[in-house]
């Protein structure tokens, strides 16, 4: 938004907890209030996702459906970007994107640029404070918002972001093996797609 370029921010609720959606809308309003180049939209994707679930009823899988929420949002972002001759801007940070790979492949990982991907999560929080982002946004427990039970990132990962950052940077960390275990599981997201090399 600070670039002065036209910026479109979207809230795309899919079976969303009301508290999560309220925070999304509050941040959208804050951006519109502070930057005249920002426009915000709420695109309700519930009915579309329900239709998707119904179509794939014989192939139900909770984890797969959770990731499908992120992929539906990614598809929506690219459609809105295409309609505006724009690009999709990512929100992933260093520990998520390059440390433990805590994102959905072809979901929230599907972006054109990633301006804060070299910042740790704790640095993103500090940056948010510096910019005057709403306190309730900064202090909200991080969550991917993909699960009906509203589980947090820490609940899924088993470590806080501060612990993950420390383990990422310190080979002697007591959490290093846990960090490495999560990283190994998700490494396929962070590496190039395997290609079968055909001999000449």
Predicted regions and their residues:
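A generic local structural motif
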Residues: 74-76
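ATP/NTP-dependent adenylation/nucleotidyl-transfer catalytic domains that generate, transfer
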Residues: 5-8, 15-16, 27, 31, ...
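Conserved SAM-binding loop
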Residues: 24
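Conserved SAM-binding loop of SAM-dependent methyltransferases across substrates and taxa
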Residues: 1-3
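Conserved Walker A/P-loop ATP-binding site and its immediately adjacent core
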Residues: 20
């Amino acid at each position: 938004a600070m670039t002065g370029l036209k910026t479109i921010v979207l809230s795309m609720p899919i079976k969303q907890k009301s508290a999560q959606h309220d925070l999304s809308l509050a941040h959208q309003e804050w951006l519109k209030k502070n930057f005249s180049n920002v426009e915000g939209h709420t695109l309700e994707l519930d009915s579309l996702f329900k239709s998707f679930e119904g179509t794939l009823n014989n192939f139900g899988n909770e984890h797969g459906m959770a990731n499908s929420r992120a992929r539906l949002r990614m598809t929506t972002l690219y459609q809105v970007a295409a309609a505006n001759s724009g690009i999709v801007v990512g929100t992933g940070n260093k520990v998520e994107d390059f440390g433990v790979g805590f994102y959905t492949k072809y979901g929230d990982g599907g972006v054109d640029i990633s301006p804060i991907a070299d910042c740790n999560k704790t640095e993103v929080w500090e940056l948010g404070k510096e910019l005057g982002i709403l306190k309730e946004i900064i202090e909200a427990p991080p969550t991917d918002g993909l699960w009906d039970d509203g589980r947090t990132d820490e609940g899924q990962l088993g470590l806080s972001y501060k612990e993950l950052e420390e383990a990422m940077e310190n080979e002697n960390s007591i959490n290093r093996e846990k960090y490495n275990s999560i990283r190994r599981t998700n490494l396929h997201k962070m590496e190039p797609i395997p290609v079968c090399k055909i001999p000449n």
